A protein has these predicted regions:
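Short, polar loop motifs at secondary-structure junctions
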Residues: 14-17, 120-124
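Active-site neighborhoods of divalent-metal-dependent phosphate/nucleic-acid chemistry enzymes
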Residues: 72-123
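Short, well-structured N-terminal submotif of metal-dependent ribonuclease cores
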Residues: 1-38, 47-59, 143-148, 153-158, ...
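Helix-adjacent hinge/juxtasegments
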Residues: 51-77
Length: 165
């Protein structure tokens, strides 16, 4: 199964908030918008600014974000994606969600890639399902792939451990 990763799922894996997704890393290929790096870094920067994480944890999470981005096919935000994001969608999504949806539609139309969407964002999921995309969080038959596990807070070296999911 190919998946399109949204930052909400990456952040959940990285921060250990909520239940971790059992399908993490168990995909044939993963795609994400170039927005993923920015969205994840901004979320971590916000936690740091609010004093919820220290400098060491911020650096460790930043490294993990880069590792995830290097393991995923990052799709550039092109003019055609931005144009498509401005077109009507089946539900009210807002700008960033529209860009994510347009990215999935571009992957499908221009490259023949049919992704299931991995997101914790209900509005994004609802719109994606209206467009015919499957919810990756509900899919169980997947092929294992090596993806990094989230950095443990107690890991003093700050190294991410690779995990064969």
């Amino acid at each position: 199964m190919d998946v399109y990763l949204d930052s909400t799922v990456v952040l959940r894996q990285m921060l250990g908030s909520g239940n971790s997704w059992d399908g993490w890393g168990k995909w044939e290929k993963a795609y994400a918008s170039m927005l993923l790096r920015t969205e994840c870094n901004q979320a971590v920067n916000r936690l740091h600014a609010e004093g919820k994480i220290d400098d060491v944890r911020r650096a460790r999470l930043g490294s993990w974000i880069e590792t995830v981005c290097s393991c995923v096919t990052m799709v550039p935000v092109t003019e055609s994606i931005l144009r498509r994001a401005g077109e009507p969608l089946p539900t009210d999504t807002g700008v960033l969600r529209s860009i994510h949806l347009a990215t999935m539609l571009e992957l499908q139309a221009a490259h023949g890639v049919n992704c299931a969407v991995a997101t914790d964002d209900d509005k994004l999921l609802r719109a994606a399902e209206c467009l015919g995309f499957e919810n990756a969080l509900n899919v169980t038959s997947v092929t294992p792939e090596v993806m990094p596990e989230a950095p443990a807070e107690e890991n003093p070296e700050g190294k991410s451990k690779g995990k064969k999911a």
